[in-house]
């Protein structure tokens, strides 16, 4: 049946029985396709019936359907004519793992960072009103904890003041949403703080419990009824107090019920919340039984068991996780913060070992950073573990709430540099540029696991300002020893005997291995190369300037955007030190990179050992030619 669905129009004639069969077919399709490519499996298994209902009720793309977050959009892609492309999911030139405007008119937003859909919806609804398209609805599907982000509530505050037809579907899969909503609970909490409330409540408890034989039972019944009423109506009160109509809760796996609720909501022609309760990983036992995250995201797996098809090596994340626990065991002031990602950022083990010193703030990076500032003010040393790409969201808080106060907060930036399959929104290629303008910050880029352990300890020893440590996604590889240490800078290789000090090659973090390969290629061409790892890349170590004096050319290699990266900082440092040595930087072009494997993206932007060696060979030749020409001019003048 799925093969016959080329677009939403093909869903309109299906009976409820056929829709149930189609839902089952979609789940089997998802399991086998995502098992082969990797991707976000659990979230999409949970929204099958919901997505079917959305496309039967609303006229996409005339009525925009915006997914927050975009990793819930696989079924949407299938129902809009892209099923045949799923073998290429998250592959180079293939189907994106998120909505993609270049793929389909049905994808309005390339949404992958959470909590933004309602703001898009608010803007679109305003635009449709102003341009006379009042018959168009805007649908925002919010789930997977996105409502824990403050931006959602900022948008709701604006949406609620209008009569524009915005339908907000809350996909409540029990992953962070429910505990964050409860208007009546807040009112009751305020009431409990009023003088006399506790006294009257306690007298009432005593009176009921004092009834012979049945008193305690009566009290428990009344207490349960009160709690049930509070839980049942708290969501409605929260939203209706804002001025937004509320429909639900609805069984999200009953397509007919969801469709009826959506049609009802569509008829309001005003802002409305449709509360849909779903189960993440629905219909796939390995996902349903995965207590950690219902197989939120997976690599290549066996579809029958849900287990990875091949063992992975030691990851950067796991090295950080182990070392943080080791440090925390020695230092009671070390605390950890995550923005709804304890597993992916390596903090699950810390949470289990030190539950009182672990804080999951939800999808709230801004709050995470300023909360960390408060923890630091109180005498603790917070470690904020976050994906590099999500650091962008907390820039102001880092600048004004942490750095301005010179607070000892350590940020651990996972997935730094090119990550690959998740595409432009998840590449961590801006963090060095962002951090480079923060006064007083110290930034480390470890080249291997041993350096990650050492630099985490060094960061925790800093008590007069913020620190950051960045590392990439994937396996950490073998340790790379230094041949010598120069005032904190590790020298990894020196020119072979008989070669001059032609090039100082500055390797940033995990690019040290590639830099050594580049040096070997250049050695075979008679070019002498010194390879160094600054370890702490910001501020630029003074020893790096001293090393530069002895070379004809300085080249930096980094997996950050060229604009404002370490190359720019090194060039500025050499100018400041009045060292007149040419400096060239190699990094990621200042443009969004499409999804592909990390290796494919690096090759496409020229970040391979052979390409870099060719570049350096050309630069060295140009410097030699220029020097010869200058000598010739000098002789002529003499």
Curated annotation (Swiss-Prot):
Q: For this entry, list what GO says about its biological process.
A: 1-deoxy-D-xylulose 5-phosphate biosynthetic process; isopentenyl diphosphate biosynthetic process, methylerythritol 4-phosphate pathway; terpenoid biosynthetic process; thiamine biosynthetic process
Q: Which reaction does it catalyse?
A: D-glyceraldehyde 3-phosphate + pyruvate + H(+) = 1-deoxy-D-xylulose 5-phosphate + CO2
Instruction: Identify the cofactor(s).
Output: Mg(2+); thiamine diphosphate
Family, similarity comment: Belongs to the transketolase family. DXPS subfamily.
Q: What does this protein do?
A: Catalyzes the acyloin condensation reaction between C atoms 2 and 3 of pyruvate and glyceraldehyde 3-phosphate to yield 1-deoxy-D-xylulose-5-phosphate (DXP).
EC number from the UniProt entry: 2.2.1.7
What SUPFAM superfamilies does its record include? Thiamin diphosphate-binding fold (THDP-binding), TK C-terminal domain-like
Q: How is the cofactor bound?
A: Binds 1 Mg(2+) ion per subunit. Binds 1 thiamine pyrophosphate per subunit.
Which positions are annotated as binding Mg(2+)?
A: 144, 173
Q: Which residues form a coiled coil?
A: none
Taxonomy, top ranks, is: Bacteria, Bacillati, Actinomycetota, Actinomycetes, Mycobacteriales
Q: In which pathway does it act?
A: Metabolic intermediate biosynthesis; 1-deoxy-D-xylulose 5-phosphate biosynthesis; 1-deoxy-D-xylulose 5-phosphate from D-glyceraldehyde 3-phosphate and pyruvate: step 1/1
Q: Which residues bind thiamine diphosphate?
A: 71, 112-114, 145-146, 173, 284, 365
Its recorded name reads 1-deoxy-D-xylulose-5-phosphate synthase
Which NCBIfam families does this UniProt record tie to the protein?
A: dxs, PRK05444.2-2
Domain of life, source organism: Bacteria
Q: Which GO terms describe its cellular component?
A: cytosol
Q: What class of enzyme is it?
A: transferase
Give the Pfam families listed for this entry. DXP_synthase_N, Transket_pyr, Transketolase_C
What keywords tag this UniProt record?
Answer: Isoprene biosynthesis, Magnesium, Metal-binding, Thiamine biosynthesis, Thiamine pyrophosphate, Transferase
The keyword Ligase appears for this protein: no
A molecular function annotated in GO for this UniProt entry is: 1-deoxy-D-xylulose-5-phosphate synthase activity
Instruction: Give the InterPro entries listed for this entry.
Output: Dxylulose-5-P_synthase, THDP-binding, Transketo_C/PFOR_II, Transketolase-like_Pyr-bd, Transketolase_BS, Transketolase_C, Transketolase_CS
């Amino acid at each position: 049946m799925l093969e016959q669905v080329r677009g939403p129009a093909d869903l309109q004639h299906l009976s409820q029985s056929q829709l149930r069969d189609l839902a089952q077919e979609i789940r089997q399709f998802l399991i086998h396709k995502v098992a082969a490519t990797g991707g976000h499996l659990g979230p999409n298994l949970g929204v099958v019936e919901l997505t079917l209902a959305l496309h039967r009720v609303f006229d996409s793309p005339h009525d925009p359907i915006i997914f927050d977050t975009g990793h819930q959009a696989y079924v949407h892609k299938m129902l809009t004519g892209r099923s045949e492309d799923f073998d290429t999911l998250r592959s180079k030139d293939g189907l994106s793992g998120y909505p993609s405007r270049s793929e389909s008119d049905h994808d309005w937003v390339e949404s992958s960072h959470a909590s933004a859909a309602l703001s898009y919806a608010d803007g679109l609804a305003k635009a449709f009103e102003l341009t006379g398209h009042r018959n168009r609805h805007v649908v925002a599907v919010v789930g997977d904890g996105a409502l824990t982000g403050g931006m959602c509530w900022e948008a709701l505050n604006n949406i609620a003041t209008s009569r524009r037809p915005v339908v907000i579907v809350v996909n409540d899969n029990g992953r962070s949403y429910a505990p964050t909503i409860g208007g009546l609970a807040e009112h009751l909490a305020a009431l409990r703080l009023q003088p006399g409330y506790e006294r009257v409540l306690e007298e009432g408890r005593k009176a009921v419990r004092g009834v012979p034989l049945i008193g305690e039972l009566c009290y428990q019944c009344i207490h349960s009824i009160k709690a049930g009423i509070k839980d049942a109506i708290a969501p409605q009160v929260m939203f209706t107090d804002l001025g937004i109509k509320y429909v639900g809760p609805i069984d999200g796996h009953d397509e007919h019920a969801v469709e009826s609720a959506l049609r009802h909501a569509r008829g309001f022609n005003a802002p409305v919340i449709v509360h849909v309760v779903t189960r993440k990983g629905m219909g796939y036992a390995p996902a349903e039984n995965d207590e950690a995250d219902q197989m939120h995201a997976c690599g290549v797996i066996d579809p029958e068991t849900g287990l990875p098809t091949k063992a992975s090596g030691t990851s950067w994340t796991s090295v950080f996780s182990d070392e943080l626990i080791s440090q925390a065991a020695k230092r009671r002031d070390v605390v950890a913060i995550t923005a709804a990602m304890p597993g992916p950022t390596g903090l699950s083990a810390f949470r289990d070992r030190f539950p009182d010193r672990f804080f999951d703030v939800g999808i709230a990076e801004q709050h995470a950073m300023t909360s960390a500032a408060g923890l630091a003010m109180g005498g603790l040393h917070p470690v904020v573990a976050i994906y590099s790409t999500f650091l962008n969201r907390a820039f102001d808080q880092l600048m004004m709430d942490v750095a301005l106060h010179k607070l000892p907060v350590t940020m651990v930036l996972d997935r730094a540099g090119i990550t690959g399959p998740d595409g432009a929104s998840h590449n961590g290629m801006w963090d060095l540029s962002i951090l480079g303008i923060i006064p007083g910050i110290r930034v480390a880029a470890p080249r291997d696991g041993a350096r990650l352990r050492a630099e985490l300890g060094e960061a925790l020893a800093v008590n007069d300002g913020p620190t950051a440590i960045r590392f990439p996604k994937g396996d950490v590889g073998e340790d790379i020893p230094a041949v010598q240490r120069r005032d904190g800078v590790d020298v990894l290789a020196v020119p072979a005997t008989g070669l001059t000090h032609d090039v100082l090659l500055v390797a940033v973090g995990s690019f040290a291995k590639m830099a050594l390969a580049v040096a070997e290629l250049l050695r075979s061409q008679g070019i002498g190369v010194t390879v160094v790892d600054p370890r702490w890349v910001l501020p630029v170590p003074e020893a790096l300037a001293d090393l530069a004096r002895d070379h004809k050319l300085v080249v930096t290699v980094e997996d950050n955007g060229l604009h404002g990266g370490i190359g720019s900082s090194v060039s500025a440092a050499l100018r400041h030190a009045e060292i007149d040595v040419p400096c060239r930087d190699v990094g990621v072009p200042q443009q969004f990179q499409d999804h592909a494997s990390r290796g494919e993206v690096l090759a496409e932007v020229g970040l391979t050992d052979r390409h870099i060696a060719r570049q350096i060979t050309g630069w060295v030749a140009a410097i030699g030619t220029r020097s010869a020409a200058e000598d010739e001019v000098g002789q002529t003048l003499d």
